[in-house]
């Protein structure tokens, strides 16, 4: 049976959730462009919402589509969260707006068109996270032939931290606003079954104001949080974090997905 949220297990002040199978903790912090943590927001800082997620069963990570593939119709994340009985939900990947990359959702293959300038993030069936940098057909086959399993894959990218190494070079053929300080949705892992989502605010946020991070800043930030693997899952101004069917990030930014 799927795990269902217990309404009594949400923490006060949108602080997270805790039951026997799931632990979620939400923390807000403020960072400079040099990736130094400061006590309060101010000139030149960026607000970062960190969501720590610890699961006990790999099937607790689920993906959902707004409409059946390949429809481009959209649904707000809050509604999708409610439809899918999600304690926590985030948006990302944007894969429907191009025709490349490897896309699996809940073990079902939707697309398998590897491109060497796209990094692939994999959540395996054991709750582990892997990133294939520059996903050629051969690298994808190698992963599968070496016993790699697939529950979900994502192709927005790029990888920011791979096996503990913070990236400092990114493929210029990818149009993910590499040099633009922006809102970023970073999905990362510390150990299997233990994930961290970093939602950084961008220039659209007014209260408090934020600058946002370019890809290099996002990678350094992920490293500062101790992530072993981290992936740029979304960005721009549409990053949405939903807890208990309510959007909890960037309250002063009206945009949402």
PLM regions: where:
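Gly/Ser/Thr/Pro-rich low-complexity, intrinsically disordered segments
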Residues: 1-257
């Amino acid at each position: 049976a799927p795990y269902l949220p217990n309404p009594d297990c949400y923490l006060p002040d949108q602080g997270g959730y805790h039951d026997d199978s799931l632990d979620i903790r939400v923390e807000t912090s403020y960072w400079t462009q040099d990736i130094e943590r400061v006590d309060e927001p101010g000139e030149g800082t960026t607000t970062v919402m960190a969501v720590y997620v610890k699961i006990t069963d790999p099937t607790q990570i689920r993906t959902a589509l707004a409409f059946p593939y390949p429809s481009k119709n959209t649904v707000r994340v809050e509604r999708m969260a409610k439809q899918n009985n999600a304690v926590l939900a985030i948006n990302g990947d944007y894969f429907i707006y191009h025709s490349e990359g490897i896309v699996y959702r809940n073990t079902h293959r939707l697309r398998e068109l590897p491109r060497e300038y796209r990094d692939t993030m994999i959540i395996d069936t054991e709750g582990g996270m892997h990133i294939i940098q520059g996903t050629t057909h051969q690298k994808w086959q190698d992963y599968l032939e070496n016993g790699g399993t697939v529950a979900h894959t994502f192709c927005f990218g790029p990888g920011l931290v791979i096996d503990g190494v913070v990236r400092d070079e990114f493929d210029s053929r990818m149009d993910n606003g590499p040099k633009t300080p922006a809102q970023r949705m970073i999905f990362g892992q510390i150990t299997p079954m233990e994930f961290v989502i970093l939602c950084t605010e961008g220039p659209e946020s007014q209260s408090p104001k934020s600058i946002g991070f370019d890809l290099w800043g996002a990678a350094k930030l992920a490293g500062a949080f101790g992530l072993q693997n981290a992936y740029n899952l979304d960005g721009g101004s549409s990053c949405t974090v939903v807890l208990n069917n309510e959007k909890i990030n960037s309250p002063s930014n009206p945009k949402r997905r």
